[in-house]
C-alpha cells in the first residue's frame, strides 16, 4: 500500500499531455491535428479514466486502513525560510478525486457530440483537460501555497471556458464578470494565507493546525487578528462557491457551453470553496465567531438562491441558482460542524446536478433544430413545453434528477439533505425553519422547470395557450447572419456496419453549425434527412453519460445508509471519513435512531410534495388553460384583498426575476462608482497634474519668446540689458540686506 501512495503525486499530471500536445500540434502541424481531432477526445477520456481507476483504488485502501498519507519535498531558500511542495492523500482528497474524474469522464464523452459542430472543438478539449489537471492538483495539495497556485489555475480555466464563445459580447462580459468577482475573493484568500503564515510560520496544513492549537491554548495569539485572517480565507471560498454576496457571477457563467456548466459550475469548481472550508475546518473550529459566520452566509445563500430561481426563464440560469442554494446547504452544514453531512451532500448533489445540466444540454440541443443557434430562444423555457413525447429518455433522466434534488426517497439527495435539515434543529431553530422552508421552495422551482419544459404543448409554435398559431419557426445560424440549412442529420449506420470508436468517413465541419460531425462513439442505427418541425432525441453518445449519471443518482445515496457491523450501525461514508471525523470529533457517534429519522423524513418529504403540488397547480397545462379562459378567476371574488395579493405576487416575481436587484446595486454603486472614480482621476491627471507641468513649460516658452523679441538680435542691446539687470540686483541687495 505504501508503494501505491508513493505514486499518487502523478495524479494531477496524467491529463496534462492532452492540452500540451494539442497546443504543440496546432502550432507545428495544424492541418494534421485538425484532421485527427477525434483522437484527442478519446485520449482525454482515456487519461482521465486512468486517474479515476487510481483514485478508486486509493479510496478502497483508505476505507480498509483509515489512514492519511503525506509526502513533502523541501526547497530550502535560506536558514529561516523554505518552501515545501508535496501531496496529501486523505478521505477528502479521494472523495474529490473520484467526483472530478467520474463526472469529468461523462462530460467529455457527452461533449464529443455536443461540441462536434463547433470550430473550437480542439480548444474545448484542451481547456477541459487543463481544468482537470488544475482541479486534481488543488485537491491533492498539502499546503496553502499549492492550494493558491492551483486555485488560480482553476479560476483561469473557468475564465477561458465561460468565455469560450468569446465572439459573443454576452459571453465575453460574463467571463470578465466571473474573473473580477473571483479576484475579490482570491485577494482575500492570499491575505489570509500570508496572515496565518505570519502567525504560525508554516503553510503545511497539519503543522499549521498543530502550531495554531498550541498558540491558542496558551493565549499567545491576537484573536481579533486571527478572526480577520480567517474571514479573509473564507472570502476565497465564498467567491469560488458562489455564496452571498459574491454569487453574482454564477448565473452569467451559463453563457459557456452546457458541458462546462455540468462539470465546472455544478460538480467540481464551485465545490472548490466547500473543499477549502472542509480542509481548514480544524482551524476554523477554534476561532471565535468564524463558524457562526460560515453558517450565516450558508443559510442566507440557501434562501436567496432558492428565491431567485423561482422566476427564471432560462433553464440553465434556473439550475445555476439551484446550485447556489444547494452549495449554501453544504456551507451551512460546515458552519454547524456537520462535516460528514456536508461532504455527503457534496457527493449526491454533484451527480444529480450534473445529470440535470447534461439533460438541459440535450434539451437545448434538440431545440436548436427549431429555433436555430440562439441561446435566448433555445434555453428559454417559455418556448419549450410538451417535450416529453419528443425526448422521452432525456425526460425520464431529468425527472430522476429533479426528484433527487427535491429530496424524494430513495434518490441520492434525500439522504444527504435530510441529515443537514436534522442537524439544523440542533444548531438553531431559526436556521432550521429557513432550511426546511427552502426545501419546499426547492421542490417548487425544480418542478416548475420540469413542467415548463416537458408538459403541455410545444410553445414555440403557439403564441398563447389558447392555440393561436404563431409564425413559422426561427432560422438563426451559428453566427446570427445566415439561416440554417434545410438538412439536419442524425448519425447513420448501415446494416453491414459495426460500432467502432473512430469513424471511417470524414464529415466536414459546417460553418453555420447545423451539420453535425460524427462522434468517436457511433451507436445510432437510423437516418433522417428532413427538416425538423419538432425536437428529437439526442444521439446515444449524449444519452449514455446521462444514463450513467442517472444510475449514480439512484444508488450513490446508499453509501450513507448505515448497516450493522459487529453490533454497530456503520455506513461506508462514515468509515471512509473516519480519520477526518476523528480529527474533528474525538468521540464520534455512529449510532442512528431510526424512529427519529423516519419522523424527520416524513416531514421533509411532505414539505417536498407540497412544493411539487403547488408547482403542478400553477404550471400544469390544465391550470394554464383554465386561467386563460378566466374560469378560475370567476370563482375568486375580485376586491381589495385580491388586488393586494396580485401586487404581492408581482413584487415577488419582479424581485426574483431581477435577481433581488443585487446585480443592479453592484452595477450602480460598485461598477458605476469605480468608473466615476476612474473618470475623475483621469480628469485630475489630464487637467491638474499635466496642467501644472504643461503650464510651467508654456510660461517658460512665453518668457523666452518675450526676452527674444526684446533683445532684437543686437549685441549692444544684450550688454545694456545685462548691465541693467545687474544694477537692479545690486540696488535691491544694498537696500534690503546691507541696510538691515
Curated annotation (Swiss-Prot):
* Recorded topology in the membrane: Multi-pass membrane protein
Which keywords fit this entry according to its UniProt record?
Chloroplast, Membrane, NAD, NADP, Plastid, Plastoquinone, Quinone, Thylakoid, Translocase, Transmembrane, Transmembrane helix, Transport
Q: What class of enzyme is it?
A: translocase
Q: Does the keyword NADP apply?
A: yes
Alphabetical GO biological process terms: ATP synthesis coupled electron transport; electron transport coupled proton transport
Entry-linked Gene3D superfamilies: 1.20.5.2700
Give the main localization category.
plastid
Q: Which GO terms describe its molecular function?
A: NADH dehydrogenase (ubiquinone) activity; quinone binding
Matching InterPro entries:
NADH_UbQ_OxRdtase_chlpt_su5_C, NADHpl_OxRdtase_5_subgr, ND/Mrp_TM, NU5C-like, Proton_antipo_N
**Which chain regions cross the lipid bilayer?**
9-29, 40-60, 89-109, 125-145, 147-167, 185-205, 219-239, 258-278, 286-306, 327-347, 354-374, 396-416, 425-445, 543-563, 602-622, 718-738
Where, subcellularly, is it found? Answer: Plastid, Chloroplast thylakoid membrane
| Catalytic reaction list | a plastoquinone + NADH + (n+1) H(+)(in) = a plastoquinol + NAD(+) + n H(+)(out); a plastoquinone + NADPH + (n+1) H(+)(in) = a plastoquinol + NADP(+) + n H(+)(out)
Please provide an example of a Pfam family that matches this protein in its UniProt record. Proton_antipo_M
Q: Which domain of life is it from?
A: Eukaryota
The catalytic activity of this protein is classed by the Enzyme Commission as 7.1.1.-
Q: How does it assemble?
A: NDH is composed of at least 16 different subunits, 5 of which are encoded in the nucleus.
Output the NCBIfam families linked to this UniProt entry. NDH_I_L (TIGR01974), PRK06590.1 (NF005141)
Chain's role: NDH shuttles electrons from NAD(P)H:plastoquinone, via FMN and iron-sulfur (Fe-S) centers, to quinones in the photosynthetic chain and possibly in a chloroplast respiratory chain. The immediate electron acceptor for the enzyme in this species is believed to be plastoquinone. Couples the redox reaction to proton translocation, and thus conserves the redox energy in a proton gradient.
Would you identify the family this protein belongs to, as annotated? Belongs to the complex I subunit 5 family.
Protein name from the UniProt record: NAD(P)H-quinone oxidoreductase subunit 5, chloroplastic
Species for this entry: Atropa belladonna (Belladonna)
What gene codes for this chain? ndhF
Amino acid at each position: 500500500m505504501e508503494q501505491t501512495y508513493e505514486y499518487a503525486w502523478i495524479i494531477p499530471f496524467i491529463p496534462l499531455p492532452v492540452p500540451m500536445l494539442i497546443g504543440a500540434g496546432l502550432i507545428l502541424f495544424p492541418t494534421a491535428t485538425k484532421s485527427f481531432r477525434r483522437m484527442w477526445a478519446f485520449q482525454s477520456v482515456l487519461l482521465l479514466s486512468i486517474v479515476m481507476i487510481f483514485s478508486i483504488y486509493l479510496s478502497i485502501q483508505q476505507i480498509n486502513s483509515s489512514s492519511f498519507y503525506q509526502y513533502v519535498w523541501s526547497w530550502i531558500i535560506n536558514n529561516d525560510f523554505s518552501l515545501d511542495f508535496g501531496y496529501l492523500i486523505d478521505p477528502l482528497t479521494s472523495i474529490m478525486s473520484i467526483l472530478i474524474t467520474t463526472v469529468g469522464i461523462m462530460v467529455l464523452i457527452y461533449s464529443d457530440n455536443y461540441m462536434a459542430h463547433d470550430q473550437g472543438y480542439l480548444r474545448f478539449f484542451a481547456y477541459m483537460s487543463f481544468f482537470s489537471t488544475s482541479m486534481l492538483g488543488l485537491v491533492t495539495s498539502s499546503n496553502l501555497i499549492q492550494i493558491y497556485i492551483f486555485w488560480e489555475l482553476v479560476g483561469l480555466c473557468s475564465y477561458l471556458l465561460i468565455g469560450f464563445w468569446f465572439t459573443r459580447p454576452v459571453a465575453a462580459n460574463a467571463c470578465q464578470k466571473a474573473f473580477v468577482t473571483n479576484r475579490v475573493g482570491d485577494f482575500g484568500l492570499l491575505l489570509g494565507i500570508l496572515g496565518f503564515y505570519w502567525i504560525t510560520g508554516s503553510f503545511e496544513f497539519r503543522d499549521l493546525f498543530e502550531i495554531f492549537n498550541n498558540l491558542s491554548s496558551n493565549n499567545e495569539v491576537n484573536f481579533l487578528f486571527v478572526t480577520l485572517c480567517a474571514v479573509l480565507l473564507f472570502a476565497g471560498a465564498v467567491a469560488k462557491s458562489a455564496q452571498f454576496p459574491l454569487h453574482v457571477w454564477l448565473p452569467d457563467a451559463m453563457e459557456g457551453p452546457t458541458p462546462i456548466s455540468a462539470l465546472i459550475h455544478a460538480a467540481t469548481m464551485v465545490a472548490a470553496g466547500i473543499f477549502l472550508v472542509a480542509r481548514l475546518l480544524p482551524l476554523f473550529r477554534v476561532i471565535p465567531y468564524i463558524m457562526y459566520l460560515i453558517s450565516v452566509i450558508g443559510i442566507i445563500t440557501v434562501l436567496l438562491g432558492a428565491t431567485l430561481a423561482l422566476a427564471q426563464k432560462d433553464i440553465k440560469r434556473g439550475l445555476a441558482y439551484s446550485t447556489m442554494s444547494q452549495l449554501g446547504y453544504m456551507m451551512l452544514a460546515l458552519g454547524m460542524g456537520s462535516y460528514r453531512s456536508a461532504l455527503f451532500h457534496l457527493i449526491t448533489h454533484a451527480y444529480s446536478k450534473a445529470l440535470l445540466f447534461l439533460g438541459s444540454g440535450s434539451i437545448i440541443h434538440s431545440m436548436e433544430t427549431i429555433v436555430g443557434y440562439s441561446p435566448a430562444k433555445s434555453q428559454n423555457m417559455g418556448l419549450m413545453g410538451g417535450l416529453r413525447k419528443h425526448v422521452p429518455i432525456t425526460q425520464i433522466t431529468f425527472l430522476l434528477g429533479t426528484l433527487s434534488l427535491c429530496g424524494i426517497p430513495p434518490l441520492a439527495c434525500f439522504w444527504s439533505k435530510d441529515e443537514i435539515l436534522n442537524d439544523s434543529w440542533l444548531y438553531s431553530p431559526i436556521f432550521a425553519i429557513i432550511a426546511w422552508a427552502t426545501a419546499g421552495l426547492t421542490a417548487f422551482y425544480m418542478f416548475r422547470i420540469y413542467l415548463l419544459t416537458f408538459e403541455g404543448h410545444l410553445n414555440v409554435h403557439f403564441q398563447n395557450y389558447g392555440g393561436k398559431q404563431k409564425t413559422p419557426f426561427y432560422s438563426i445560424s451559428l453566427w446570427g447572419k445566415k439561416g440554417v440549412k434545410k438538412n439536419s442529420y442524425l448519425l447513420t449506420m448501415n446494416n453491414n456496419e459495426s460500432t467502432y470508436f473512430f469513424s471511417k468517413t470524414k464529415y466536414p465541419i459546417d460553418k453555420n453549425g447545423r451539420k453535425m460531425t460524427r462522434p468517436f462513439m457511433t451507436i445510432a442505427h437510423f437516418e433522417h434527412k428532413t427538416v425538423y418541425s419538432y425536437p428529437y432525441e439526442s444521439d446515444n453518445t449524449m444519452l449514455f453519460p446521462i444514463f450513467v449519471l442517472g444510475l449514480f443518482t439512484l444508488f450513490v445515496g446508499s453509501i450513507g445508509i448505515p448497516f450493522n457491523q459487529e453490533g454497530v450501525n456503520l455506513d461506508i461514508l462514515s468509515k471512509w471519513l473516519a480519520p477526518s471525523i476523528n480529527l474533528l470529533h474525538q468521540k464520534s457517534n455512529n449510532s442512528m435512531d431510526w424512529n427519529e429519522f423516519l419522523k424527520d423524513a416524513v416531514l421533509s418529504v411532505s414539505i417536498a410534495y407540497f412544493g411539487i403540488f403547488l408547482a403542478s397547480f400553477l404550471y400544469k397545462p390544465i391550470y394554464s388553460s383554465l386561467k386563460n379562459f378566466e374560469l378560475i378567476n370567476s370563482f375568486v371574488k375580485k376586491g381589495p384583498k385580491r388586488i393586494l395579493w396580485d401586487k404581492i405576487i408581482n413584487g415577488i416575481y419582479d424581485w426574483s426575476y431581477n435577481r433581488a436587484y443585487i446585480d443592479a446595486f453592484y452595477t450602480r454603486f460598485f461598477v458605476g462608482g469605480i468608473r466615476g472614480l476612474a473618470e475623475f482621476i483621469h480628469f485630475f491627471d489630464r487637467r491638474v497634474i499635466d496642467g501644472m507641468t504643461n503650464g510651467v513649460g508654456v510660461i517658460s516658452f512665453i518668457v523666452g519668446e518675450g526676452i527674444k523679441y526684446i533683445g532684437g538680435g543686437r549685441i549692444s542691446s544684450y550688454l545694456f540689458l545685462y548691465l541693467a539687470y545687474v544694477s537692479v540686483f545690486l540696488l535691491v541687495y544694498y537696500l534690503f540686506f546691507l541696510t538691515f
